[in-house]
Design a protein with these regions (language model features):
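C-terminal beta-strand edge segments of enzyme domains
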Residues: 3-34, 261, 265-352
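N-terminal active-site segment of His-dependent metallophosphoesterases
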Residues: 15-78, 223
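Conserved hydrophobic/aromatic positions in well-ordered beta-strands
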Residues: 47, 153-155, 287
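Active-site-proximal beta-strand/loop segments in catalytic clefts of secreted hydrolases
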Residues: 51, 83, 137-140, 169, ...
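Active-site beta-strand/loop signature of hydrolases that rely on acidic residues for catalysis
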Residues: 60, 68-98, 134-136, 203, ...
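A charged helix-plus-loop insertion that forms the helical arch/lid used to bind
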Residues: 94-111
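CN hydrolase (nitrilase-like) catalytic-core segments centered on the catalytic cysteine
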Residues: 107-136, 204-306
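Active-site catalytic loop in hydrolytic enzyme cores
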Residues: 141-237, 242-253, 318-328
Length: 352
């Protein structure tokens, strides 16, 4: 970047002011950033794992077990891990056989994986006074069709986690080398505190999916698991503008847009730090965005951290009521309607 160019710094959250920084403490060796949203203790407490999964299944499983114990200690009700947190992320075609072998040995029914997952499940509760739900990203082997999917599973005490899953629909070009596209079937979860929809990473870039969840399924909150990268450059030389971490910028933008456009909460758990196989970085910043589009709390962009947001009033701030503290003056339900698929009026501007 030349000396007179201006750099857009992606690790500053423009326009969002906070009087006090969230408390950060060490719990069992993990940094925990802890905030409280409301005084309504009947609302759920979320914990988001902003972590760096390795290409090492045993390490990842041990890491996950430790974080689950932290969730118990801090009183979290819902714990969200990032995408492919058991296998580690995929990389290039030169190592395709190695990646495929890793994926095959990390699925939920592999003995060592199943042992850990079943142990976590046995510690869950079926009420609101403890950890009762865990979202985690892993490989799903569809043996009936011989397909491998990049999936998010939902673990509760009373159900088989292999039965509650979402297969990622919008795969990146790299992911298409290793996974099959999901079937377009969304996953909607009804809980006492509200209705949840599940998305994964690149899904955030496709607005139709969020719209379907919000206006057809009427969810209150979107849960997104991700392995979202940080670095790529966008530059406008004549304006002397450059951003080196464009993907990080988009991570924030997409969550804010998803929340504000659809008047839902957006909660994202992302990988963070250097990806050992490529040297590239994941942008972290796992966080919570309110229906206003404003980020309420987020994790580090460069190191592992656990985010806790207590007593999150999901249903009390959903889009139907339009009582969230934002500047929309019109109620979505009174104004919004689907746009009919009719031909546009086209006008030729002669000479222009």
């Amino acid at each position: 970047m030349s000396g007179n160019q201006r750099e857009i710094r992606a690790n500053t959250w423009a326009g969002v002011k906070r009087e006090d920084e969230p408390t950060v403490t060490l719990v069992s060796g993990y940094k925990v950033r802890d905030v409280t949203f409301s005084k309504n203790e009947a609302c759920p407490t979320f914990m988001l794992a902003n972590i760096n999964p390795r290409f090492d299944i045993d390490y990842n499983l041990s890491h996950i077990e430790d974080i689950v114990q932290v969730a118990h200690k801090v009183g979290a009700n819902i714990l969200v891990f990032p995408e492919l947190c058991i296998s580690g992320y995929v990389w290039d075609t030169d190592h395709k056989a190695e990646v495929q072998e890793q994926l095959k040995t990390s699925h939920n029914n592999q003995p060592e994986v199943k042992k850990v997952l079943d142990g976590i499940k046995s510690g869950l509760v079926d009420h609101d006074k403890g950890l009762n739900m865990v979202f985690f990203g892993n490989v799903r082997m569809d043996r009936s069709h011989g397909k491998i999917h990049d999936s998010t599973f939902v673990m509760t005490q009373g159900a088989d986690y292999n039965d509650i899953f979402y297969d990622k629909i919008f795969l990146t070009p790299m992911e298409k080398l290793f996974f099959h596209r999901g079937s377009d079937r969304r996953l909607v979860l009804d809980a006492r505190f509200g209705r949840m929809g599940v998305m994964m990473c690149y899904d955030l870039c496709f607005v139709e999916m969020g719209k379907m969840y919000a206006f057809t399924d009427e969810v209150d909150v979107m849960i997104t698991t991700a392995a979202w990268r940080m670095e790529t450059v966008r530059e406008y030389p004549l304006l002397k503008l450059r951003i080196d971490n464009y993907y990080q910028f988009i991570w924030r933008l997409m969550h804010s847009a998803l929340a504000a456009h659809n008047q839902v909460w957006s909660i994202g758990a992302n990988c963070v730090g250097v990806f050992e196989k490529t040297g590239g970085r994941f942008c972290g910043e796992s966080g919570v965005w309110s229906p206003s589009g404003i980020p309420l709390v987020h994790a580090s962009h460069d190191e592992e951290e656990l985010i806790v947001i207590r007593d999150l009033e999901i249903r009390g701030h959903m889009r139907h009521q339009a009582k969230e503290h934002f500047d929309y003056s019109l109620d979505f339900d009174e104004v919004y309607r689907a746009i009919k698929n009719i031909k546009p009026k086209r006008v030729s501007l002669d000479g222009l």
